[in-house]
A protein has these predicted regions:
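Short intrinsically disordered coil segments
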Residues: 76-78, 135-144
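Short, conserved beta-strand element in jelly-roll/cupin
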Residues: 61-64, 73-88, 93, 123-125
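Short, charged low-complexity intrinsically disordered segments located at boundaries
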Residues: 91, 110-112, 150-154
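A short, N-terminal "cap"/entry segment at the start of jelly-roll beta-barrel domains
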Residues: 1-54, 138, 148-157
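Short, surface-exposed loop and linker segments with low hydrophobicity and enrichment for Pro/Ser/Thr
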Residues: 68-78, 113-116
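Conserved short histidine dyad/triad with adjacent acidic residue
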Residues: 38-48, 53-73, 93-96, 103-107
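Ligand-binding loop in jelly-roll beta-barrel domains
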Residues: 93-96, 104-134
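Long terminal segments
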Residues: 130, 143-150
C-alpha cells in the first residue's frame, strides 16, 4: 500500500544488503527516538553493514529551541551539516548549509540550538560515535545510553 511505513531494524537492513547489495529506506522507516533529558529527536543508520564497527554512521537530529548540549568529543572523525535552523558551537553561530568537520578526540561545545531549533546531519567515520564527556560535564545532556540502546550495531543489543 502506497504511503504505508514499514519499520526496518538494523538487522532487516543488513539482511537485505547481504541479499541484494543495496537497500532503499527512509528516516520514517528507520524510526527515531527522543532523548528524555533534552527533547532531541534523532534517527541513525550505518553506511554499509550495520554490524560492522568500521561502517560510517549517520545521524539526523532535531534540537529544540535553545537546547544546550554540553561540551564533548567523539572517538572518531565526523562532519556535521546544518540543514535547518541555527546552532551555536563553541561560541560560533552556524547556519543552513554550514559544514563543520571535526577530528576524533578534539573537544567542542557547548552546542546551543537557535530560537527556532536546528536540524543537523552528522556523519561519523565509523561506529565509534558515542559522545565522551570533557571538562566539568556530567554527560546528562548527551543521551549516550539511550542512543546506544537504540542505535548500536546490529547484533550488539
Amino acid at each position: 500500500m502506497a504511503g504505508e511505513i514499514t519499520h526496518q531494524s538494523p538487522e532487516d537492513i543488513e539482511n537485505e544488503l547481504v541479499r541484494r547489495g543495496h537497500v532503499v529506506t527512509s528516516w520514517d522507516s528507520i524510526g527515531e527516538i527522543t532523548i528524555e533529558a533534552t527533547g532531541v529527536e534523532t534517527s541513525s543508520y550505518r553506511i554499509g553493514l550495520p554490524s560492522l564497527e568500521s561502517s560510517p554512521t549517520v545521524f539526523k537530529a532535531y534540537f529544540p529551541p535553545d537546547c544546550r548540549i554540553e561540551a564533548h568529543t567523539h572517538a572518531c572523525d565526523y562532519s556535521e551539516i546544518i540543514l535547518e535552523g541555527t546552532q551555536k558551537v563553541s561560541g560560533k553561530w552556524l547556519y543552513p548549509g554550514d559544514i563543520r568537520i571535526g577530528l576524533a578526540n578534539r573537544g567542542y561545545g557547548p552546542l546551543i540550538a537557535g530560537p527556532e531549533g536546528v536540524t543537523v546531519l552528522v556523519i561519523f567515520a565509523d561506529g565509534h560515535w558515542p559522545a565522551v564527556t570533557i571538562g566539568a560535564g556530567d554527560g546528562s545532556t548527551l543521551g549516550t545510553g539511550e542512543l546506544l540502546d537504540r542505535f548500536s550495531a546490529a547484533g550488539e543489543n
